[in-house]
A protein has these predicted regions:
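Bacterial N-terminal signal peptides
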Residues: 1-4
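Extracytoplasmic cell-surface/polysaccharide-interacting catalytic and binding patches
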Residues: 6-91, 103-187
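Segments that shape or occlude catalytic/ligand-binding pockets
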Residues: 94
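A short acidic (Asp/Glu
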Residues: 97-102
């Protein structure tokens, strides 16, 4: 029976990591929320590490409570802006990957942007309760937010938005896009 289950999972294209996440109760975003795209940035070399970190993790996984909040955010977005949709860049993250990320930023100016895996059990991503998302237009292009994903600098800080507007580092359109994303994710 175990062999048959493994064979079925492998036929469905799921890795051991993805099967493990499902076994502990995490859910696959693409399977649970139609219309939300998944582009796992750490499964590509296009991230702050410059290399593939998620070998065998191409799908986004969340705990059911986080999944429900993402579902509500998606529904709210569809009501407000039919021309936009959500893309998930990151969700549940293996602790071993968090440790690799921390090694790169530890004792640098960038360490405020990566959770220390040795404190409080690591970051929320390690438990499938955090999700990194952005908004894309109908052509699939991310709408301007004032900074790129994985940008580790002041332009990514929401607590500095007023200052960023005043200095011209972000513009009003980018601010409104950020506010829309925050609104749907927190309402």
């Amino acid at each position: 029976l175990t062999f048959a289950a493994c064979q079925l999972a492998n036929e469905q294209g799921k890795s051991d990591i993805e099967n493990g996440l499902e076994q502990i109760g995490l859910q696959n975003v693409a399977e649970e929320i139609p219309g939300v795209e998944v582009y796992m940035v750490y499964a590509t070399p296009y991230n702050f590490m410059g290399r593939v970190l998620y070998d065998g993790l191409d799908e986004a996984y969340l705990v059911p409570e986080a999944m429900e909040k993402l579902r509500k955010a998606n529904e709210l977005l569809r009501k407000k802006r039919m021309d936009l949709h959500l893309v998930v860049y990151d969700a549940a993250r293996p602790r071993s990957i968090q440790q690799q990320m921390w090694k790169v930023v530890e004792n640098t100016d960038l360490q405020d942007f990566v959770a220390n895996p040795n404190k409080s059990g690591g970051g929320a991503h390690n438990y499938g309760i955090a999700v990194d998302v952005t908004l894309v237009d109908c052509t699939g292009h991310p709408i301007p937010m004032g900074s790129e994903y994985d940008y580790f600098g002041d332009r990514s800080r929401v607590d500095l938005e007023t200052q960023l507007i005043e200095t011209g580092e972000i513009n009003q359109r980018e601010l409104k896009n950020r506010q829309l994303l925050r609104e749907i994710m927190t309402e």
